[in-house]
Curated annotation (Swiss-Prot):
This is Probable nicotinate-nucleotide adenylyltransferase. GO terms for molecular function: ATP binding; nicotinate-nucleotide adenylyltransferase activity. It comes from the Bacteria. It is an enzyme of class 2 (transferase). Its EC number is 2.7.7.18. It catalyses: nicotinate beta-D-ribonucleotide + ATP + H(+) = deamido-NAD(+) + diphosphate. Belongs to the NadD family. PANTHER family: NICOTINATE-NUCLEOTIDE ADENYLYLTRANSFERASE-RELATED (PTHR39321), PHOSPHOPANTETHEINE ADENYLYLTRANSFERASE (PTHR39321:SF3). HAMAP family: NaMN_adenylyltr. The gene is nadD. InterPro entries: Cyt_trans-like, NadD/NMNAT, Rossmann-like_a/b/a_fold. It comes from Cereibacter sphaeroides (strain ATCC 17023 / DSM 158 / JCM 6121 / CCUG 31486 / LMG 2827 / NBRC 12203 / NCIMB 8253 / ATH 2.4.1.) (Rhodobacter sphaeroides).
Amino acid sequence: MVVGLLGGSFDPPHPGHVHITREALKRFGLDRVWWLVSPGNPLKPRPPAPLARRLAEARRLMRHPRVAVTGLEAEIGTRFTAETLAVLQRRYPGVRFVWLMGADNLAQFHRWERWRAIMESVPVGVLARPGAGLRARTSPAARRYASALLPEAEAARLGRSAAPAWCFVNLPMMDLSSTEIRATGRWRG
């Protein structure tokens, strides 16, 4: 089984998250996607809304038989993605995991704790985001792992590829972001 992992604050979850999840299922040869709604993001200056609220809203929004919305990081007590991946790989030895991220995250991936360990442990599926394509494609992580890049036409192989492997896919984009939703006051933490 191949499971895509979409981690994030989901503060708030929105239709853009649903869109990239559905696209990831189609493009990367995934059997399932697990949303990992994180307790917090070490790279963000302010804490998110309460986890229970974000989980409830994510579950209300993401209704798909092949997608599970989870609070796994809070349950297992991990703070960083590399730690979470190590625990999941030990806990589910028969599952092949693919880390999913928007292009905006690839652009600053080199700031993540143990980002190279992430690239070396699981394939990574990168989904285009408005305004982030060039920054992502020229980022330190993209340059460092340029030889591991799969062509977009071979994206369906990603889930069966050995790490390091990554693929950038273009897709119809939705110009939504949690940051912008919070700024409008439509979501209160």
